[in-house]
Amino acid sequence: MKNTNVIRSAYDALAESYNRWIDHKPHNAYYDRPNTLKLLDDVGGKSILDAGCGPGKYAEILMSKGASVTGFDFSPEMIKHAKERNKNKGTFFVHDFSTPLTMIADQSFDFVLCALALHYVEDWNDTLREFHRVLKDQGQLIISIEHPFFEYTYFKSTDYFKIEAVKCTWKGFGFPVEINSYRRSLHECIKPLTENGFYIDKLVEPKPVRAFEALDPKHYKELNEFPAFLCIRAVRK
């Protein structure tokens, strides 16, 4: 990732408040997680790689359902919180998406989960090839990303088809933090999957669950009219 250090610094700065808010922050707790988790089949007894695990909330949920979880994130502070949250359960380590997962053997996992993280990677191809390598035959890759149509509108882009470095300021974690990521077209979300050994099994334009409304009625209404995220289940060929 060209912006790795910038993104890492932002998430290191956010880590404490992000971890504190993640259980009930509406876009995470009542929009992303319920819709993304629906794409995972029964995880009891299964092995899951949580790629871009943040403070380990997904890992906490999945391990409570009987899964074995290994998580990585490029933010050392996020990994510290993931370990603290999950105590002695699971395995967590610092790793950059843009480098190979040399510490993981071929066909090690039943699932790879990558929730709201791939949009920090400019070129998905190497990352998806690694996900394909570490998945078992017919293993599933579950991803959630910012919806390309939402991003195109939000960032007021002029060339929809361009993979474009973008940035915005997050203000929902107690203090403003500039977040850098990459916007891309729907085609550029699907093509790297189908060209790197996956087929698309399910694609969801999610709506928030009802608990979102009491906490943020404005965005609840907006998200029921136009999606901000996109959830995809892809299967290893």
Q: What function would you assign to each model-found segment?
A:
Residues T102-V112:
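A short acidic, Gly/Pro-enriched loop at the edge of an enzyme's catalytic core
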Residues I179-V204:
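Short alpha-helix
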Residues F111-W124:
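A short SAM/SAH-binding and catalytic strip from SAM-dependent methyltransferases
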Residues I143-I145, F149, G172-E188:
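Acceptor-substrate binding/catalytic loop of class I
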Residues N125-Q140:
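A short glycine-rich, Lys/Arg-flanked "PGG" loop and its adjoining helix->strand segment in the class I
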Residues M1-G44, K57, I61, M78-H81, L141-T169, ...:
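Conserved class I S-adenosyl-L-methionine
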Residues L49-A51, P55-P100:
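Class I SAM-dependent methyltransferase SAM/SAH-binding core
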